[in-house]
Amino acid sequence: FEAIIKPLDYEVSKMRTIKSEDELKIIEKACRISSLAHIRAMKSVKPGMYEYQLEAEYVHEFMSHGARACAYPSIVGGGKNACILHYNENKNILNDGDLVLVDAGCEFNNYASDITRTFPVNGKFSKEQREIYEIVLEASKKSIETVVSGSNPLKAHETSVEIISQGLLDLGLLEGDVNEIIESNKYFDFYMHRVGHYMGLDVHDVGGKDINGDWLNYAPGMITTIEPGIYINESLDVPEEYKNIGIRIEDNVVVTETGFKVLTDLVPKEVNDIESLMNS
């Protein structure tokens, strides 16, 4: 007889891409625990703390709610460390006047969560920090709006690129025509990663592409992160007051039958809400 041997990885990936109701409940729980941890950190941070001490606040909150592990090594980057995408040494002092970028999420019953928030160590954004933050926030909101059934993940990324490029142009940190900036990838010096990835049993989960490697359209039950960012390292030719500002905002979003649901909206991300929480 004849037998046809086919790899199963693609079929298994498809199954993992669409979450069942039971899976969604677990992931929602993981997202809630991680959200509470970010809130705890915003209330706890103060100048003079070490990055690892702030990291400990997350671990404490995770375990207090039954999440015994982090979904990935936490990133706690203060000041210029926030401009390093996968910084996880977490060993430096958090200084007055700096921002701290924290990318941290727990694993609960084998499922991941993945949240990033950026907030001022002293509880108050500077003018320049706020200007950059508002660009990233706008990119976050508009990109999330594209996470609906039938839309393609490329649209979410392109939306974030357009908003970030225009925002940097408006501030004078990029020059030229916005379309030329995008086509020539000039924005890439400030925003060098994709806007999101699928999430589930792994924090960077499998699936999302067809057998030819093309992105599948969003469908109900898919969970993606949306995480635009701007990273202004000290080597860039920009005014001194903008250097070493690194900002990312990351939420976990599930596609529903009627639109989308943000699983991590418990954590504030509006500037006024963050400052109010930190100074309460």
Regions found by a protein language model. Give the residues of each.
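Active-site neighborhoods and metal-handling regions in enzymes and metal-associated proteins
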Residues: 1-280
